[in-house]
């Protein structure tokens, strides 16, 4: 086969791949599928992408390579026909609070450019467009100052820019200027110290020194004109008699200060200034609209848009509690009589008793306790058993007291304690828009840049399509190319089903599927051709309705002339592909082979392919023969949920059932289930400090004694954490080894078999098994420790054997092998068998937690819950548990979830996978659309009821599935 038409892989052995030979057609949409852990990602990411990326990076200079992450060479004999590779995974969502949907997609960068070039500044005082100031207006403003005021007339020639500026200073000296102000300090030009070119500097030239007198006008006008020429339309009148000593950097002494007038200076601009309030904008450049740049960022919140502030709801978590019983949470833990005596004194002044509930206090009394007596003096009597005293003073208030202590304390422990009562609130200075007043005063079509980022992508798309109608000819010409780039990117975001997000949405709050689709939209926006794209389950978190749009996007990427490889389990994606590779036959050591390849029809015709059997209907996830009975009395009821886009929603969740919360992306599922129900329930039942979304109340929590959110966050952030340590299987394994005759004879305790503490571990690598060597412009090399040869333990520890295996050998077994190996040790076997039950028999007992995918981490947590003794009163909440699961794995997972329900527990899942929804006892469908068009309950009831609701998109797709597939009593066809 010619290299041009195929990517030819020979002898791929990465991870569990069994010497795979494969030819993939170029410029096609290729789907790789197979059971979880069968080797799809090993082939797509760790072999094909890694080699494509490595070869591209290797072609760069050694200097450039040190800035790029270099991939390890995969274990493969040969790959031909590769292009430079780009991977779009789910793991790389930025948690940086400064990263937003707008910045990630680069739409915000184009918006900054648009506002800088065609935006019109308006005065906050008058609401009128800001005009430029004339020299006469500037002179009048200075003459209006108090007579005798001494001023420097300065020209701000450098503002916040890096450089040494030796040449510029020499030029100024030649022109006859003698003094400059550099970074807040005055110097003779000859005496200016060398400036560090790596740092930003401010340089003002002293053009004149004047004393305000009525006859100053002519001289002042000349000086100001000189300034305006030197500093590109800017001039500063700085008060010489300022309170700070000369030689110190003045607070706000730089020309870029946001207010045009301070106690030190007046900033004039012949470009933009409000004649009424004097509000001046130094410049309108793209950086003015950047919240990551000091020129544009709101100085109060540093461009984050939020501030940590004491939250009154966390101070008084339960309004029905009595004051003496700890209604004021920060005081509740203290055993000192001081706080109760403080409340008694306040009670005498405001007419309440300490036995009163918080809800019974007057508004005046509540305000006094929380915010202080505002100068009103209170007489306090204190008696701590050792001494008694009386004092009369105003009461500071719980919240001001905590705020003061938080600012003043040097103790990390004290800060942490106080932070438990703090919540993130929108910044009061910028209202959460992140920018300075100057940036927000610039508008296009009566909207500032912050208001546009708050729109949903759907609305922003419509706004940008219509806005050039309000431009004049010149503005239209300037904006044409910028608008084209913005509209294209918004259109792509719409196409991948993200029309409900806002551009201001923080990247850290996006789900894996959302962030992946955002990066997908950015890639299409870049318009590259001849590239190899490797994607990891882009359909995660996407409703069936939006699936077609996503697949159109992938086909568009292919049609640009790229090869698109997608690791995917979605039926529609597999059937749409040009070429399908099915890897199996099972997971882990039992996988790693290509079972079937070719068109979707070829896969269905292949009798060895498990995927083919599910696609053709020969096997299926079956609908239960009968659904559980719904209790009319035992149910949870969420009343009046109003968080995010929820529109005062109330819904019942029957206890002891399997409930699915469904709906299109952005319909309000996570807000309803995680932000409202889970956070409120865990606060009431588990005593957590999570702050739930706005709602009236939740009824029925008395039927529960535990609430658990089994999410996809990592089970540990270090390589030392693994499935055995997380599920608790490692403790009985260590105990077992410590109980062996050889260990007893040597006096070894269980700690001897831990790789985290000194004693039994190899000290050369400190129990890691590998040693990291930094290589700068080559990838960091992890070399196997030459003392323990990667075993993590020292020789003496490894001498203790059970059935001929050391503790290191046990950690290297798959979970399946481990369960068999410890079949006679129930404490270990039972925990490992639960991992097998959730479909994780293929992972290693000691596999590093950092190498587990989100779906795998979630199933490890599920296994841990399964191994606990059932109380039958637990509420389990899972967000998309089928992430990364093949049809066959979904069937297994459903068995596990239904088993939890059979024990009397309640399981609620957020899910788009119709195979899961059809087996649910109860469905709550939210929508009908995403974002503003969602937040309502569209349908509720059994799956058969949802199908009847015309407005429900879920119902429409579910109807096809229920009609297509018969009912069976078994959970999965074997």
From Swiss-Prot:
Its biological purpose: The UvrABC repair system catalyzes the recognition and processing of DNA lesions. UvrA is an ATPase and a DNA-binding protein. A damage recognition complex composed of 2 UvrA and 2 UvrB subunits scans DNA for abnormalities. When the presence of a lesion has been verified by UvrB, the UvrA molecules dissociate.
Keyword Metal-binding: yes
ABC transporter domain: residues covered: 331-610, 630-959
GO terms under biological process: nucleotide-excision repair; SOS response
Major subcellular location class: cytoplasm
Alphabetical list of PANTHER family matching this protein: UVRABC SYSTEM PROTEIN A (PTHR43152:SF3)
Protein family: Belongs to the ABC transporter superfamily. UvrA family.
ZnF start-end (C4-type): 762-788
UniProt keywords, alphabetically: ATP-binding, Cytoplasm, DNA damage, DNA excision, DNA repair, DNA-binding, Excision nuclease, Metal-binding, Nucleotide-binding, Repeat, SOS response, Zinc, Zinc-finger
High-level lineage: Bacteria, Pseudomonadati, Pseudomonadota, Alphaproteobacteria, Hyphomicrobiales
Gene for this chain: uvrA
Subunit structure and binding partners: Forms a heterotetramer with UvrB during the search for lesions.
Protein name: UvrABC system protein A
InterPro entries the UniProt entry points to: ABC_transporter-like_ATP-bd, ABC_transporter-like_CS, ATP_grasp_subdomain_1, P-loop_NTPase, UvrA, UvrA_DNA-bd, UvrA_inter
Domain of life: Bacteria
């Amino acid at each position: 086969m010619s290299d041009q038409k195929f990517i030819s892989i020979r002898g791929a052995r990465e991870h569990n791949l069994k010497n795979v030979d494969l030819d993939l057609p170029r410029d096609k949409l290729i789907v790789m599928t197979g059971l979880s852990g069968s080797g799809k990602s090993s082939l797509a990411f760790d072999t094909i992408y890694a080699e494509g990326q490595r070869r591209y990076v290797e072609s760069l200079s050694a200097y450039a390579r040190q800035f790029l992450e270099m991939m390890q060479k995969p274990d493969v004999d040969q790959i031909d026909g590769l292009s430079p590779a780009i991977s779009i995974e789910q793991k790389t969502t930025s948690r940086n609070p400064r990263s937003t949907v707008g910045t990630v997609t680069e739409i915000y960068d184009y918006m900054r450019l648009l506002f800088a070039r065609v935006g019109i500044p308006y005065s906050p005082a008058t609401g009128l467009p800001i005009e430029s100031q004339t020299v006469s207006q500037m002179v009048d403003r200075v003459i209006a100052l108090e007579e005798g005021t001494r001023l420097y007339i300065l020209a701000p020639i450098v503002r916040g820019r890096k450089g040494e500026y030796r040449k510029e200073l020499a030029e100024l000296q030649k022109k006859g200027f003698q003094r400059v102000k550099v970074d807040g300090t005055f110097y003779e030009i000859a005496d200016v110290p060398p400036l560090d070119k790596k740092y930003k500097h401010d340089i003002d030239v002293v053009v004149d020194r004047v004393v305000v007198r009525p006859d100053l006008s002519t001289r002042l006008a000349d000086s100001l004109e000189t300034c305006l020429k030197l500093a590109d339309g800017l001039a500063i009148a700085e008060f010489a008699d300022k309170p700070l000593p000369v030689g110190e950097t003045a607070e706000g002494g730089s020309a870029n200060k946001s207010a045009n007038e301070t106690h030190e200076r007046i900033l004039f601009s012949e470009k933009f200034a409000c004649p009424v309030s004097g509000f001046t904008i130094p410049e309108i450049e793209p950086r003015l609209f950047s919240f990551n740049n000091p020129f544009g960022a709101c100085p109060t919140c540093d461009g984050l848009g939020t501030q940590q502030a004491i939250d009154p709801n966390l101070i008084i978590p339960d309004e029905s509690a009595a004051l003496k019983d700890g209604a004021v949470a920060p005081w509740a833990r203290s055993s000192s009589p001081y706080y109760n005596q403080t409340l008694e004194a306040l009670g005498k002044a405001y007419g309440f008793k300490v036995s009163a509930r918080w809800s019974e206090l007057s508004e005046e009394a509540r305000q006094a306790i929380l915010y202080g007596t505002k100068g009103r003096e209170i007489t306090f009597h204190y008696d701590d058993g050792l001494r008694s005293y009386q004092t009369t003073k105003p009461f500071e208030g719980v919240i001001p007291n905590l705020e003061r202590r938080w600012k003043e304390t040097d103790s990390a422990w004290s800060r942490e304690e106080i932070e438990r009562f703090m919540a993130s609130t929108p910044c009061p200075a910028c209202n959460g828009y992140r920018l300075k007043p100057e940036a927000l005063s610039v508008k296009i079509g009566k909207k500032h840049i912050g208001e546009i980022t708050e729109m949903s992508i759907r609305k922003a798309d419509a706004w940008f399509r219509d806005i050039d109608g309000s431009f004049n000819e010149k503005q239209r010409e300037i904006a044409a190319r910028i608008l084209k780039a913005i509209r294209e990117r918004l259109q792509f975001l719409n196409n991948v089903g993200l029309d409900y997000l806002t551009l201001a949405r923080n990247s850290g709050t996006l789900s894996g599927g959302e962030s992946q689709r955002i990066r997908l939209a950015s890639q299409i926006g870049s318009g590259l051709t001849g590239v190899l794209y490797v994607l990891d389950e882009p359909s995660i978190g996407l409703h069936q309705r939006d699936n077609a749009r996503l697949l159109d996007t992938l086909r568009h990427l292919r049609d640009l002339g790229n090869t698109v490889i997608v690791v995917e389990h979605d039926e529609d994606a597999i059937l749409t592909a040009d070429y399908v590779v099915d890897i199996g036959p099972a997971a882990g050591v039992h996988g790693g082979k290509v079972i079937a390849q070719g068109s979707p029809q070829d896969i269905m015709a292949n009798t060895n392919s498990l995927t083919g059997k599910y696609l053709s209907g020969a096997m299926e996830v079956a609908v239960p023969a009968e659904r559980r009975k719904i209790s009319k009395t035992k149910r949870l009821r969420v009343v009046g949920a109003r968080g995010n886009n929820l529109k005062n929603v109330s819904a019942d969740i029957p206890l002891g059932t399997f409930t699915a919360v469904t709906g299109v992306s952005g319909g309000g599922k996570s807000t309803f289930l995680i932000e409202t129900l889970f956070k409120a329930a865990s606060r009431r039942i588990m005593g957590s400090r999570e702050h739930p979304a706005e709602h009236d109340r939740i009824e029925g929590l008395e039927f529960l004694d535990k609430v658990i959110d089994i999410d996809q966050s990592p089970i540990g952030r270090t390589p030392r954490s693994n499935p055995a340590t997380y599920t608790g299987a490692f403790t009985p394994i260590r105990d077992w080894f410590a109980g062996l005759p050889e260990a007893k004879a040597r006096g070894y305790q269980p700690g001897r078999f831990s790789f985290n503490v000194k004693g039994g571990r190899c000290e050369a690598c400190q129990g890691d098994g590998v040693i990291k060597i930094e290589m700068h412009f080559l990838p960091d090399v992890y070399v196997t420790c030459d003392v323990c040869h990667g075993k993590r333990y020292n020789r003496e520890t490894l001498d203790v054997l059970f059935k001929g295996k050391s503790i290191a050998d046990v950690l290297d077994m798959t979970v399946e092998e481990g369960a068999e190996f410890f079949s006679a040790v129930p404490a270990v076997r039972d925990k490992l068998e639960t991992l097998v039950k959730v479909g994780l028999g293929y992972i290693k007992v000691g596999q590093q937690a950092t190498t587990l995918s989100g779906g795998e981490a979630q199933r490890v947590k599920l296994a841990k819950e399964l191994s606990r003794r059932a109380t039958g009163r637990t509420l389990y909440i899972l967000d998309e548990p089928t992430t990364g699961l093949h049809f066959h794995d979904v069937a297994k997972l459903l068995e596990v979830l239904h088993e939890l329900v059979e024990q009397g527990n309640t399981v609620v899942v957020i899910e788009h996978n119709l195979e899961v929804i059809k087996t649910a006892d109860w469905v709550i469908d939210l929508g009908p659309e995403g974002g503003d068009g969602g937040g309502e309950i569209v349908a509720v009831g059994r799956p058969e009821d949802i199908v009847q609701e015309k407005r429900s998109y879920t119902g429409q797709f579910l109807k096809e599935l229920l009609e297509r597939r018969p009912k069976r009593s078994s959970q999965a066809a074997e």
